[in-house]
UniProtKB/Swiss-Prot annotation:
EC annotation from Swiss-Prot or TrEMBL: 3.1.22.-
Cellular localization per UniProt: Nucleus
Biased composition (Polar residues): 181-210
Protein name: Crossover junction endonuclease EME1
GO cellular component: a single term: nucleus
A molecular-function term among this protein's GO annotations: endonuclease activity
Gene field: EME1
Cofactor(s) this protein cannot do without: Mg(2+)
Length: 690
């Protein structure tokens, strides 16, 4: 196998090449230069200098200028040849025994990054990374090293790497074992990390005759920031080295099937290669074999933060930009896999067309009786008695029996609400509504109709604290499924838990007694008999709490977990007496939801609407609340302008009226603010600038 070394022509350190009997086989020299060179290799002084250096090193062997090839993006490569002796002049090859003396140039680091991106994005069908530690030399702690061992697994055992047609090396082929070593540098610069791939990929072909122009076959593109997302903590053994390990074994095998022969369906093969890369990068099971692992120094953290795309939040009190990657909150798997419908608060509603709207309005205004019903169902405000007459509660029989066992008159406290028992297996309370109108979602009006019983999109689950947490410890999955089966159907689920404070106090007392027992056991022998007597007097409820094995301080954490993972709202209450009052308030909230203007007009619900007695009162209140004008100045403006619209007409015309005493009606700052308010089309423009 041959060896490839990346060198910097600006580094003049002399390095001897020691191989078998003083020869070094298969040396490929990579150089970089500033800017792109379109001329032939013979006209390039850098190529001429390199060829001259090679000629001096090999002695009698001739080195042609064609041995040095210029690729795009200022990357030059010389083909493999046997060299005896030493490189001199201004060309040097790095070795692991003696580091180079001069630092790496910025241009060379940029070219090195381009080469790495070119190898990664090209269609090379090469198996990656041999695990043989003896085959790869040790890496110095003073420089960044990029290792990539490429072993052939094709039956022929050889790869032909065709370069662009202008290259004189198209006719030559070798089998390489790459080890790319850079010049010594402590850290990688930001520009070398974010450099885009080169435009001329190395495409694989089994025969020279199957070569295509490199312009016809472009490498598949993917997210250049993908490698940064897969960054892992650095190994302490390479604390001083910023290295990139490319383990692309499975990926290269797939690419060989895609790019082994270049046939006519090039675009299809490129898409398949892109899918292969994307799946390998995002597959959790293949991270060990199909990933790019980036290791960097701790000093590189500042540089890495610069490369991340920050998310700037306007009007934020945070002084530093927020990384968008850190803000990406991953939902639990059960939430991702299931499509939860949005809650639909408006029942018995549908959109009406303009023709249907005109027909319904004509029908509602046809007779006095229909007109009365039409006005009744479109009232803005509803009384509490009207809301309770519309609502129906279906309570589970087990919950009802539990309430009656506590001698609570549940039906009497919720009158005139209609209560019906249901016999479901879950402790659930459902809400229903007697609808005597249908809502037009397009035009925002109600039409009278026959009475229809509709199901509201809210339900209540009632649990006692101790059995709930006991089931959480023994059958968490079943508890999740029981709660979430309602939220998956578009229901808003509310979990009511009674007896939580009593359970917390009992757990605290039990923990204190356990602590006392442990202390007494360590004091005297008589204490052991006392602890045994206490064990005999232990109650059944305390035994259940011991089996619960939950500390009192963890109860709130479990409630938060239920709220997040089960997608519900948890309301702990003291006892069932409090539950009846709580349910009455909940019925009022659910009942008036259908007539709430913020629900009916959701697209305008963010606006704060205030009403006034008259147009003059509206303008007077506006000047005080929005324009921050005191009462005398507001009254002065209102004496001339009687409405908000009259002032707007004058502002758009470009003038403001004077007062009766021939003095300005308002201050200049207020004029500018009102003119901006009336004429601006930019929602982000400031009204007051001083």
């Amino acid at each position: 196998m041959d060896e490839v070394n990346i060198i910097d022509i600006n580094d003049t350190t002399e390095q001897s090449l020691v191989g078998n009997e003083g020869t070094a086989n298969g040396v490929v020299v990579l150089i970089s230069s500033e800017g792109e060179r379109e001329g032939p290799p013979a006209s390039d002084p850098i190529h001429y200098s390199l060829a001259r250096s090679l000629s001096d090193s090999v002695g009698q062997r001739n080195v042609e200028d064609d041995d040095v090839v210029l690729l795009e993006n200022s990357v030059s490569v010389s083909f493999s040849l046997e060299v005896e002796g030493r490189f001199q002049n201004d060309t040097a090859i790095e070795s692991d025994n003696e580091p180079a003396s001069q630092p790496q140039t910025q241009t060379f680091k940029r070219s090195q990054s381009r080469l790495l991106d070119e190898i990664e994005n090209s269609g090379l069908s090469i198996s990656a990374l041999s695990d043989d530690e003896e085959a790869s030399p040790l890496v110095s702690n003073q420089r960044s090293v990029i290792h990539k061992n490429i072993e052939s697994e094709v039956k022929s055992g050889k790869y032909i790497i065709p370069l662009p047609q202008s290259s004189p090396l198209e006719k030559m082929s070798q089998v390489f074992n790459y080890q790319l070593a850079s010049s010594p540098t402590p850290n990688k610069s930001p520009s070398s990390r974010s450099t885009l791939p080169v435009k001329s990929p190395l495409q694989l072909s089994t025969t020279v005759a199957n070569k295509r122009s490199y312009r016809e076959v472009q490498p598949p593109k993917f997210d250049p920031y993908l490698t940064r997302k897969l960054k892992k903590p650095q190994n302490k053994a390479t604390a001083d080295v910023s290295s990139v390990a490319l383990d692309l074994t499975k990926y290269m095998e797939d690419c060989h099937d895609l790019y082994g022969t270049l046939v006519s369906d090039t675009h299809i093969r490129q898409q398949r290669s892109l899918d292969t890369k994307t799946n390998s990068y995002h597959s959790e099971s293949n991270y060990e074999h199909d990933s790019i692992v980036i290791e960097s120094d701790e000093d590189d953290d500042i540089t890495n933060t610069r490369q991340e795309k920050p998310l700037f939040v306007q009007h934020s009190s945070q002084s530093t930009p927020v990384s968008s990657n850190k803000l990406a909150l991953r939902q639990p798997r059960h939430v991702e896999d299931e499509k939860i419908d949005k809650v639909k608060p408006m029942v018995n509603a549908r959109p009406f067309t303009d023709q249907e709207y005109s027909e319904m309005v004509k029908k509602c205004l046809g007779t006095s009786e229909m007109r009365k019903l039409y006005n009744e169902c479109n009232k803005v405000s509803r009384t509490e008695e009207t809301i309770y007459n519309e609502m129906i509660l279906t309570v589970n029989n087990k919950v009802m029996e539990l309430i009656h066992s506590k001698h609570i008159s549940f039906e009497e406290e919720l009158k005139p609400l209609t209560i019906i028992q249901n016999y479901e297996e879950f402790p659930i309370i459902r809400f229903k509504r007697k609808c005597r109108s249908i809502y037009d979602q397009t035009h925002g009006v109600f039409y009278p109709c026959d009475e229809v019983i509709a199901n509201e999109s809210i339900c209540v689950l009632v649990y006692e604290a101790l059995p709930f947490f006991h089931r959480y410890r023994t059958d968490k999955r079943g508890l999740w499924d029981e709660i979430r089966q309602f939220s998956k159907n578009g229901m808003k689920v509310i979990v009511v838990m009674y007896g939580l404070n009593a359970l917390r106090k009992k757990l605290c007392n039990m923990e204190n007694r356990q602590h006392e027992d442990r202390v007494l056991e360590q004091l005297s022998g008589s204490a052991s008999s006392q602890s045994q007597s206490k064990t005999r007097r232990r109650s059944t409820q305390e035994t259940k709490m011991r089996e619960l094995n939950i500390k009192s301080k963890n109860l709130d954490r479990i409630i938060n977990e239920v709220t997040i993972y089960a997608n519900v709202d948890v309301f702990p209450i003291e006892n069932l007496n409090e539950f009846s009052h709580w349910m009455k308030n909940l019925v009022w909230v659910v009942g008036k939801m259908r007539y709430d203007v913020s629900v009916k007009y959701k697209e305008w619900s963010h606006l704060n609407v205030k009403s006034g007695k008259s147009p003059t009162d509206v303008l007077y209140s506006f000047l005080q609340q929005v324009a921050h004008v005191n009462e005398p100045k507001a009254k002065r403006v209102v004496t001339h302008y009687k409405s908000f619209q009259s002032m707007m007409n004058d502002m758009k015309a470009g003038y403001v009226a004077q007062s009766h005493d021939n003095k300005p009606l308002m201050p200049k700052s207020l004029e500018r603010a009102l003119h901006t308010l009336y004429t601006s089309d930019d929602p982000n423009e400031l009204i007051f600038t001083d």
